[in-house]
Amino acid sequence: MDLRAMNSGVSGLLAEQQALGVVGDNIANVNTVGYKAERAIFEDVLGHSILAGTSSGLPGAGVAIGAIKQNYTQGSLNTTGVSTDVALSGDGFFVANGSVDGITGNFYTRAGQFTLDKDGYLVNPTGLKIQGYSANGDGTYSASLSSIQAPTTSIQPRATTAATVTANLDSTATPPTNAWGDTNTTFASQSNFSTTQTVYDTLGNAHTMDLYFRNTGTGTYDWHAVMDGTDTNSTGSLTFGTNGALTGATGTTVDFAPTGADPMTIALNFGTPVAAGAASVAGSMTSFASSSNVSSQSQDGYASGDFSGISIDGQGVVTGLYTNGQKLAISQMGVAKFRSNDGLGRAGDSLWIDTRDSGPAAMGTAASGGRGSVSSGSVESSNVDLATEFVSLIQHQRSFSANSKTITTADEMLQELINIKR
């Protein structure tokens, strides 16, 4: 009697058992961040070698699991609100460098549950360092990958050297009767309008700079600078054309000697003067027949600041945040892309490695070259569909039972054959 049926049944049991393990692995990882569901690929087994010219009616010898493939479709994004949590929307993998089971090098992950370690490195839960392109400080980034490290030390203060004021000065304002510098009257009574900015010295101390503007009644406004309530004797004038556009500016620096710090010279920028009759340039002072008001003002100084954390934008740019409100670019996260994701090898801990089948990693940045964008404060959920997995459980259970029935039937037939001799 041919025992092929029994062998086929055994192969079916083994294959279904292995497939059931795949389903169980999926269900177990339903809450694993960045996990990609697996599926078992069944292949038939021939009882003979394939030879040229043989009959197409070769007998089968059961079934085997030919491969276990992962499904790399996008998982849903789960908002966490944690600034170091990131997710990729689209193709690609974050790059993590370190050692896993004695293998040292780059590993690839979709699980963006990152943190800053004690040395400021951005790391995954197992301590692998996330790779990126370091910021050069001039808006460009290095050409090679390195570990992303936040400079957790304090940022040094920067003295104010330039300040910008954009405002409208009412052309119909009545010139004040009190003269500049009259010690018996206030600065406010000597002017029509004023602005206030906080500026910083070389030690990072804050100072209040008040600019007072006085209409002369001749298409000109004089300005006067006061620092911390004390007259700096820094003055100048702004002239305006008949259309209200700025046509000239004089005396555009403020000099101040703070106690214990280096003397300060602040260059004032009131905008770009134009020729008489020309239209005003955006961002310049104006003098129209409307109430005086400031539209914008800024200065380039700041106090010292302590590191307070990082932010990550949609292109993976990692920015250091400081308590003084400053932001400094640190790095841009590297994103790896492969010719065939199916060829990647699993390394555990939500990591993959490149193989000959996947091809080498093509390094780049988020939202470029077909790579996905980065979502900060979110993680990518597992793409396991529980409903599908439960259906697969039932299918594999039924198939397992059917294969066991094949074995018992073949056994009964063999027993009948043995009984013939009796």
Q: Which role does the model predict for each range below?
A:
Residues 1-39:
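N-terminal intrinsically disordered, low-complexity, charge/repeat-rich segments that act as generic
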Residues 4-7, 14, 59, 387, ...:
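Register-specific recognition of a single heptad position within extended alpha-helical repeats
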Residues 13-16, 20, 386, 393, ...:
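Amphipathic alpha-helical coiled-coil segments
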Residues 36-385, 390-392, 399:
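Small/polar low-complexity and glycine-rich loop motifs
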Residues 403:
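Acidic/polar, glycine-anchored loop/turn motif associated with catalytic or activation segments
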Residues 413-422:
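Structured functional modules or segments
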